[in-house]
Amino acid sequence: PLLNFSLERSPLPGQMHPGLNLGNKVLDIFIHLARLAKKDGLLAFPAYFHNALLFSRAFHFFNPKKQGEILAIRKSLFHIPFKQMAWIVHLNCLKDKEGRIYEWKAEEMVFSINKALRKYFGSRAYKEKVKKTQERLKFDIDWICYKKRIEKEGLEKLP
Protein backbone atom coordinates (compact mmCIF):
# COMPACT_ATOMS: atom_id res chain seq x y z
CA PRO A 1 0.00 0.00 0.00
CA LEU A 2 2.99 2.33 0.17
CA LEU A 3 3.80 2.19 -3.54
CA ASN A 4 2.49 4.74 -5.99
CA PHE A 5 1.52 4.42 -9.62
CA SER A 6 4.00 5.39 -12.30
CA LEU A 7 4.08 5.84 -16.07
CA GLU A 8 5.00 2.16 -16.37
CA ARG A 9 2.38 1.07 -13.88
CA SER A 10 -0.82 3.07 -14.23
CA PRO A 11 -3.99 2.20 -12.29
CA LEU A 12 -6.95 0.14 -13.36
CA PRO A 13 -10.41 1.60 -12.64
CA GLY A 14 -11.05 1.70 -8.89
CA GLN A 15 -7.44 0.91 -7.99
CA MET A 16 -5.92 3.04 -5.22
CA HIS A 17 -2.49 1.37 -5.05
CA PRO A 18 -0.49 -0.89 -7.37
CA GLY A 19 -1.33 -4.57 -7.04
CA LEU A 20 1.01 -7.18 -5.62
CA ASN A 21 0.56 -9.71 -8.47
CA LEU A 22 -0.73 -12.33 -6.03
CA GLY A 23 -4.10 -12.98 -7.71
CA ASN A 24 -3.31 -16.50 -8.94
CA LYS A 25 -1.80 -17.54 -5.61
CA VAL A 26 -4.79 -16.19 -3.69
CA LEU A 27 -7.17 -18.01 -6.05
CA ASP A 28 -5.23 -21.25 -5.51
CA ILE A 29 -5.63 -20.83 -1.74
CA PHE A 30 -9.39 -20.19 -2.07
CA ILE A 31 -9.80 -23.25 -4.31
CA HIS A 32 -7.85 -25.38 -1.84
CA LEU A 33 -9.97 -24.13 1.09
CA ALA A 34 -13.22 -24.69 -0.83
CA ARG A 35 -12.20 -28.27 -1.60
CA LEU A 36 -11.21 -28.90 2.02
CA ALA A 37 -14.59 -27.54 3.14
CA LYS A 38 -16.31 -29.70 0.49
CA LYS A 39 -17.94 -26.70 -1.20
CA ASP A 40 -19.51 -26.88 -4.65
CA GLY A 41 -17.57 -23.94 -6.01
CA LEU A 42 -16.43 -20.38 -5.54
CA LEU A 43 -18.54 -17.33 -6.29
CA ALA A 44 -17.18 -14.00 -7.52
CA PHE A 45 -19.09 -10.80 -8.17
CA PRO A 46 -16.78 -8.63 -10.30
CA ALA A 47 -17.52 -5.00 -9.50
CA TYR A 48 -15.43 -3.84 -12.45
CA PHE A 49 -15.27 -5.09 -16.02
CA HIS A 50 -11.54 -5.78 -15.76
CA ASN A 51 -12.18 -8.02 -12.74
CA ALA A 52 -14.51 -10.10 -14.89
CA LEU A 53 -11.81 -10.41 -17.55
CA LEU A 54 -9.27 -11.50 -14.95
CA PHE A 55 -11.66 -13.94 -13.28
CA SER A 56 -12.71 -15.39 -16.64
CA ARG A 57 -9.46 -17.37 -16.77
CA ALA A 58 -10.95 -19.72 -14.17
CA PHE A 59 -14.58 -18.62 -13.61
CA HIS A 60 -17.68 -18.62 -15.82
CA PHE A 61 -20.67 -16.34 -15.57
CA PHE A 62 -23.59 -18.35 -14.26
CA ASN A 63 -25.73 -16.54 -16.85
CA PRO A 64 -24.63 -17.81 -20.30
CA LYS A 65 -25.75 -14.56 -21.94
CA LYS A 66 -23.36 -12.58 -19.73
CA GLN A 67 -20.59 -15.03 -20.63
CA GLY A 68 -21.34 -14.45 -24.32
CA GLU A 69 -21.39 -10.68 -23.78
CA ILE A 70 -17.89 -10.68 -22.28
CA LEU A 71 -16.57 -12.91 -25.06
CA ALA A 72 -18.12 -10.60 -27.68
CA ILE A 73 -16.41 -7.58 -26.12
CA ARG A 74 -13.08 -9.39 -26.04
CA LYS A 75 -13.52 -10.39 -29.68
CA SER A 76 -14.52 -6.88 -30.76
CA LEU A 77 -11.59 -5.33 -28.87
CA PHE A 78 -8.99 -8.06 -29.45
CA HIS A 79 -6.48 -5.44 -30.62
CA ILE A 80 -6.84 -3.22 -27.53
CA PRO A 81 -4.50 -3.65 -24.53
CA PHE A 82 -6.14 -4.97 -21.36
CA LYS A 83 -5.74 -1.79 -19.28
CA GLN A 84 -7.02 0.44 -22.06
CA MET A 85 -10.01 -1.86 -22.58
CA ALA A 86 -10.78 -1.61 -18.85
CA TRP A 87 -10.80 2.20 -18.99
CA ILE A 88 -12.83 2.31 -22.22
CA VAL A 89 -15.60 0.32 -20.53
CA HIS A 90 -15.31 2.15 -17.20
CA LEU A 91 -15.54 5.58 -18.87
CA ASN A 92 -18.63 4.46 -20.85
CA CYS A 93 -16.90 4.81 -24.22
CA LEU A 94 -17.88 1.40 -25.59
CA LYS A 95 -20.94 1.21 -27.83
CA ASP A 96 -22.93 -1.67 -29.23
CA LYS A 97 -23.72 -2.00 -32.94
CA GLU A 98 -26.83 0.19 -32.52
CA GLY A 99 -24.71 2.97 -31.00
CA ARG A 100 -25.94 2.49 -27.42
CA ILE A 101 -23.43 2.98 -24.63
CA TYR A 102 -22.37 -0.28 -23.02
CA GLU A 103 -22.67 -0.07 -19.26
CA TRP A 104 -20.96 -2.69 -17.09
CA LYS A 105 -23.37 -4.56 -14.83
CA ALA A 106 -21.81 -7.14 -12.53
CA GLU A 107 -23.23 -10.66 -12.30
CA GLU A 108 -22.20 -13.81 -10.48
CA MET A 109 -19.22 -15.78 -11.73
CA VAL A 110 -18.59 -19.35 -10.58
CA PHE A 111 -15.51 -21.52 -10.28
CA SER A 112 -16.82 -25.09 -10.47
CA ILE A 113 -15.57 -27.65 -8.02
CA ASN A 114 -18.35 -30.22 -8.09
CA LYS A 115 -19.42 -32.36 -11.03
CA ALA A 116 -22.89 -30.80 -11.38
CA LEU A 117 -21.49 -27.29 -11.87
CA ARG A 118 -18.85 -28.51 -14.34
CA LYS A 119 -21.62 -30.33 -16.19
CA TYR A 120 -23.75 -27.16 -16.31
CA PHE A 121 -20.95 -25.02 -17.77
CA GLY A 122 -19.96 -27.80 -20.17
CA SER A 123 -23.51 -28.47 -21.33
CA ARG A 124 -24.60 -27.99 -24.91
CA ALA A 125 -27.43 -25.67 -23.80
CA TYR A 126 -25.04 -23.36 -21.89
CA LYS A 127 -22.49 -23.32 -24.71
CA GLU A 128 -25.14 -22.64 -27.37
CA LYS A 129 -26.53 -19.66 -25.43
CA VAL A 130 -23.00 -18.30 -24.99
CA LYS A 131 -22.28 -18.72 -28.70
CA LYS A 132 -25.56 -17.16 -29.87
CA THR A 133 -25.06 -14.15 -27.62
CA GLN A 134 -21.44 -13.74 -28.68
CA GLU A 135 -22.36 -13.87 -32.38
CA ARG A 136 -25.23 -11.40 -31.96
CA LEU A 137 -23.25 -8.71 -30.12
CA LYS A 138 -20.69 -6.38 -31.70
CA PHE A 139 -18.98 -3.44 -30.04
CA ASP A 140 -17.05 -0.36 -31.14
CA ILE A 141 -15.01 2.22 -29.27
CA ASP A 142 -16.06 5.86 -29.25
CA TRP A 143 -12.53 7.30 -29.42
CA ILE A 144 -13.73 10.90 -29.12
CA CYS A 145 -15.51 10.00 -25.88
CA TYR A 146 -12.42 8.16 -24.63
CA LYS A 147 -10.03 11.04 -25.31
CA LYS A 148 -12.36 13.58 -23.66
CA ARG A 149 -12.97 11.43 -20.60
CA ILE A 150 -9.34 10.53 -19.92
CA GLU A 151 -8.50 14.24 -20.13
CA LYS A 152 -11.35 15.13 -17.79
CA GLU A 153 -10.29 12.43 -15.29
CA GLY A 154 -6.62 13.44 -15.50
CA LEU A 155 -5.62 10.11 -17.00
CA GLU A 156 -3.76 11.43 -20.04
CA LYS A 157 -0.86 9.06 -19.41
CA LEU A 158 -3.05 6.05 -20.17
CA PRO A 159 -2.67 4.43 -23.59
Task: Provide a role label for each language-model segment.
Residues P1-H60, K65-S76:
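Acyl-donor binding region in acyl/amide transferases
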Residues I70-P159:
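Intrinsically disordered, low-complexity, charge-dense segments enriched in Lys/Arg
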